[in-house]
């Protein structure tokens, strides 16, 4: 598989054909299936947190962490902000890095915590915080197999009042 699909990080290949009167178009989509996320409710009402669990497809892969992003619902911009061109960025600066839990007695030097993601024999589980209130939350799971980390899965949640 590593030789047949580019970069070795893709596990599936989708092939499509587009046909018109004077043209034939071939397109390919490379997809990597690296984690199986267990079913979870993705439309949340006023929750403080929800538990996410997943299994790793490749037993040699290692969880590096999860980037956890928050984006508030868009609000109408005032005429003054529109004139100045003060448009908010797509991703706000509200993100956090959820790290694998360390063994008892070990702590991360940066903040003194043990980490947030519980490692299991074939995967992981984590309590995802919705601490910023209503909005869109996205988790990007990063794995490594010895050659650097890569995004292996993504899941988004909608939180409403």
Show which residues each predicted segment covers.
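Short, surface-exposed beta-strand/loop "edge" segments at domain boundaries and coil↔beta transitions
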Residues: 37, 76, 147-149
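Short beta-strand elements
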Residues: 145-161
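Conserved glycine-centered beta-strand/turn positions repeated across beta-sheet architectures
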Residues: 52-54, 135, 139, 150
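Aromatic/hydrophobic beta-strand junction motif of beta-rich domains
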Residues: 50-60
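Solvent-exposed, conformationally flexible loop/turn segments
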Residues: 44-49
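A well-ordered secondary-structure block
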Residues: 1-34, 58-77, 86-142
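Proline-enriched interdomain boundary motifs that mark the N-terminal boundary
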Residues: 35-41
């Amino acid at each position: 598989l590593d030789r047949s699909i580019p970069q070795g990080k893709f596990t599936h290949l989708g092939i499509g054909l587009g046909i018109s009167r004077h043209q034939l178009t071939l397109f390919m989509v490379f997809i990597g299936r690296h984690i199986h996320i267990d079913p979870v409710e993705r439309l949340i009402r006023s929750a403080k947190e929800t538990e996410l669990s997943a299994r790793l497809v490749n037993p040699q892969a290692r969880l590096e962490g999860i980037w956890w992003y928050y984006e508030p619902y868009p609000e109408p911009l005032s005429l003054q902000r529109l004139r100045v061109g003060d448009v908010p960025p797509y991703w706000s600066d509200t993100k956090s890095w959820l790290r694998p839990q360390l063994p008892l007695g070990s702590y991360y030097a940066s903040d003194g915590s043990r980490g947030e993601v519980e490692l299991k024999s074939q995967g992981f589980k984590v309590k995802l915080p919705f601490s910023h209130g209503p909005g869109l939350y996205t988790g990007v799971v990063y794995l490594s197999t010895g050659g650097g980390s890569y995004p292996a899965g993504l899941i988004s949640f909608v939180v409403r009042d």
